[in-house]
């Protein structure tokens, strides 16, 4: 399965954040849209980073001062690993496992068109396994009939 098909199946609108927005705004958006990360985009809608719940916990709340005034650009991951819509889902799983990340922005022509999570990929693999099991249970029944 291609990433393009996966983000179409998910059908969720991509939520993003700007580098000059505050961590409070990130937390509100993560909570409102039930997300674990947000791609960070510039004024031209190009991907410039990603911020995750883990970034906030490790880099912001570990500080002794308040996070209210901290800007996204201060704690976001700037070297973003991303995928394209034409990549295979298996490739995305391999990259996420190798890089130890749980969210992979999908970029086309420099713009974020989707966000794939490890959970999305696991859900697809689980569905594929269920389908395989269903068909494998039907197969013996069909082959037992004599062909006339």
Residue ranges and their predicted role:
Residues 13-16, 46-47, 82, 111:
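Short, flexible active-site loop motifs that bind/organize anionic cofactors or intermediates
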Residues 1-12, 52-82, 88-97, 118-148:
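Tandem CBS (Bateman) regulatory domains
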Residues 16-34, 41, 82-100, 107:
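The conserved cystathionine-beta-synthase
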Residues 30-33, 38-54, 96, 104-119:
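A glycine-centered beta-loop-beta connector
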């Amino acid at each position: 399965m291609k990433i393009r098909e996966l983000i179409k199946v998910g059908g969720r609108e991509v939520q993003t954040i700007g580098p000059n927005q505050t961590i409070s705004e990130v937390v509100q958006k993560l909570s409102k849209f039930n997300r674990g990360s947000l791609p960070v985009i510039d004024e031209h809608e190009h991907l410039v980073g990603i911020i995750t719940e883990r970034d906030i916990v490790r880099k912001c709340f570990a500080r002794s001062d308040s996070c209210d005034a901290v800007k996204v650009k201060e704690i976001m991951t700037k070297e973003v690993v991303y995928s394209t819509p034409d990549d295979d889902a298996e490739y995305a799983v391999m990259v996420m496992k190798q890089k130890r990340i749980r969210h992979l922005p999908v970029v086309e022509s420099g713009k974020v068109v989707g966000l794939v999570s490890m959970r999305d990929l696991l859900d697809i693999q689980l569905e594929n396994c269920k389908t395989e099991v269903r068909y494998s249970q039907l197969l013996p029944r069909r082959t037992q009939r004599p062909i006339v």
